[in-house]
Structures are given as structure tokens and as C-alpha cells.
Amino acid sequence: MLFRSGRARVRAALHIVVLNLLGSAIFLIAVGAIYAATGTLNLADLAAKVATASAGQTGLLRAGGLLLLVVFALKAALVPLGFWLPPAYAAASAPAAALFAIMTKVGVYAILRVHGLVFGPDAGATASLLSPWLLPIGLLTVLVATLGVLASRDLRRLLAHLVVLSAGTLVLTLGLDSEAATSAALYYALNSTLVGGGLFLLADLIARERGAARTRLDCEQAVARPALLGTLFFLGAIGVAGLPPLAGFAAKLYILQSAYLHTAASWVFSAILLSGLLVIVALSRAGSALFWRTGDT
């Protein structure tokens, strides 16, 4: 994060350090509560011991599980704990931002492991402990991130909001609580992570071609190689928006199929389809500003 100088990068790095220290402290408290109740931290052992936990251990397990959700939600930048990600990723260098886009999904994967293995449907009194939280958190994250994408006036910040949007989509899908939804989430995670990281690297190439305008979505400076960079941007845009024929379309289709019979299907369909449409609008506007218009027109 601090590979290059700059006030924005120093501020973003400071935020990341403070939040990571806070998250680590909460994580230790959560782990301590779970260990006190079960005497183990091995996930396989936890799954067995949580299922047979006594009434006296249930309180510690619930507290530990919910604290873990808070920690992993902070790592994955979910609402209301995701305020730090857009400015941090927008200020980071391209390689760092691309790596961070991958690391953000680690928080979602941790939620998947804890939710599915430790507090799954066979976890006794703590069965499906995280289920009531995942779907609402995912929906709110998708909503806030979509608004952030639309409001962005810088390509890097727009891409940072897309990272948050993909994390929200994953958590929303995990909240459906089915094997089909989990499979769809894993497929979507692979696609969104690769495309998101690639777009951050592409943003750095665009910035070098635009001079002082960098990645601002204005018309001050045209891109020197619009054909090549424009084609790459178009491919990345349809990939992240979920349009055919790229894998993003299949990933979102699998998510919708897994939600078809769920009681919250209307909310999931609305969130996925509306966010996809608005992302297309935002990326079309960004592409127009970067490749088609200049300050002389």
C-alpha cells in the first residue's frame, strides 16, 4: 500500500492498519469464546462438538459465532463495515489493488466455512446461526455498492465499489442456504475475482495513457490507444456486469436458478438484475468518457 508516496495512500494505509488491529482483537475474543466452550479450534472437531453442545455452552458459541461474522464482514467490506475499502483500493497501486481484490474474497470464504461447516443445519441449538444475517447484509451491501458505482467519478473508485458489490452478491447467495447456491457462489467468486483484478491492472494502463487526467471520468485527455485498451475494457465490463458470452453471465444465471424457489426469490432477483443493469449504465458512461469523448468535442 505504501510502495509509492502520497497523502491519500498514507491515509488509506493508516485506516487499513487500524481496522486490521481492531478486527484482530475481535477475532481473538471470538476464538477465545469458542475455545472456552468446545476446547478445540479444528473446524472438523468444532462441527462435531457444536452439534452436541450443552445449554451452558450455547451462549458462548453464539457470541463467538456472531463476532466471527463481524470480523469476516469487516474483511470482506460488507455493509455497514465496508466504508474503508473504496478510498483504500482507489489509492493503492495497480498490483496492490488487484491483489487486494482477491484478498477481499477471503473474508467471504471464511464466512462460508464457518456458516456451512461449524454452524450448519446440524449444529444443534446453534444451527444456522448466521443464516438470518447473511441475506439482509448481502442485499444492503449490493444496494450501497451499486449506488457507489453510479456515483463514482474516478475509474479506480468505481472498480473498488465493484469489489464491494461482488462481495455482497456472494454473501447474498450464501444466505440462500442450499448446495446449489453455494456452488453458484463459488463459481461467481472465481469469475468476479479474476475480472476485478484484471480491471485494476487495466486502469493503470489507462491512467498512463491519459496524462494528467489519469483515471478521472472526465474528458480532459483522450486515451492514446483506444482500440486496444477499449477492447480490453469492454471485455472486462461485460464480464463484471454478467453479460453473455463470458462466464459472468453463467455465474449470475446459476445464482438466479438457485434462488428460484427461495422465499426471498423476488428480493434476490431484483438485487441481481437491477444491480447488473445499473453497473452496465455506469461502465458504459465510464467507457464513453475514457475512449470516445475528449475535451475538444
Task: Please describe what each predicted stretch is.
Residues M1-T297:
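Alpha-helical transmembrane segments of multi-pass membrane proteins predominantly involved
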